[in-house]
Amino acid sequence: MDKVAVVIQNYNGYRYLETCFAALAKQTFTEFTTYFVDNGSQDESCAFLREHYPETKIIQLDDNYGFSRADNNGTRRSKEPYVILLNNDTEVFPDFVERLYEGICKRKNAFACSAKLISYQERDKIDDAGNYYNMLGWAFARGKGKPVSEFE
């Protein structure tokens, strides 16, 4: 059994899938299974994956139930001990899965970890380097708009 599940939720995101899945195919750590949860898309998303990435486990929902339900559905269907939630419009570095897996394994008490998100439009800027929460539970993106070099 693989050690990691990568769960990708989708709704009519065909235009993003080649970039996302090509990056996953280049991972240095290969002990992962990809689960693709489709929220009733009307585009060619599932057909594209069946043709180009047939190893992907496709979970087709009959309607657009939204981000959370799709992620929860994929997480429940996975059998791997660790789960990475990944957006369909994401392009990851080749060591993405490896670094998250190694990071979570180093901390016995950790229940979650997060990747550094770099802006797609401005590749030298941080989109999110972890979140801060205030007393009311509002989340704030750490490092938003700051140089990537500050978060190495």
For the regions a protein language model found, what residue spans apply to each?
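Acidic helix N-cap motif at the loop->helix transition within catalytic regions
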Residues: 43-51, 95
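Conserved donor NDP-sugar-binding/catalytic core segment of glycosyltransferases
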Residues: 93-127, 131-134
